[in-house]
Amino acid sequence: VKRPMNAFMVWSQIERRKIMEQSPDMHNAEISKRLGKRWKLLKDSDKIPFIREAERLRLKHMADYPDYKYRP
């Protein structure tokens, strides 16, 4: 069972698609670096919808898998 996505992962999933459409030849490592920098520059108020979605996913995950324990 996969862990639920955090706010950054929710946001980056959307943004990664946009970057890949604009620059299909860009390497994944470069995309990840850019996403990390852009997330850090994003205002806290702009992060709120993604934080809320991550929380919703976390609660759903807890309901769907009540005995789940993260094991790396």
From Swiss-Prot:
A GO MF term:
DNA-binding transcription activator activity, RNA polymerase II-specific
The protein's name in its UniProt record:
SRY-related protein AES4
Task: Show the SUPFAM superfamilies listed in the entry.
Answer: HMG-box (SSF47095)
Annotated DNA-binding ranges come to 1-69
Protease among the record's keywords?
no
Q: Name one GO cellular component term.
A: nucleus
BP GO terms, sorted: brain development; camera-type eye morphogenesis; negative regulation of transcription by RNA polymerase II; neuron differentiation
Q: Which UniProt keywords apply?
A: DNA-binding, Nucleus
- Asked if the Swiss-Prot or TrEMBL record annotates the protein with the keyword Nucleus, the reply is yes
Q: What is the lineage of its organism?
A: Eukaryota, Metazoa, Chordata, Craniata, Vertebrata
Which organism is the protein's source? Alligator mississippiensis
Out of the domains of life, which is the source? Eukaryota
State the InterPro entries in the record: HMG_box_dom, HMG_box_dom_sf, SRY-related_HMG-box_TF-like
Compartments where found:
Nucleus
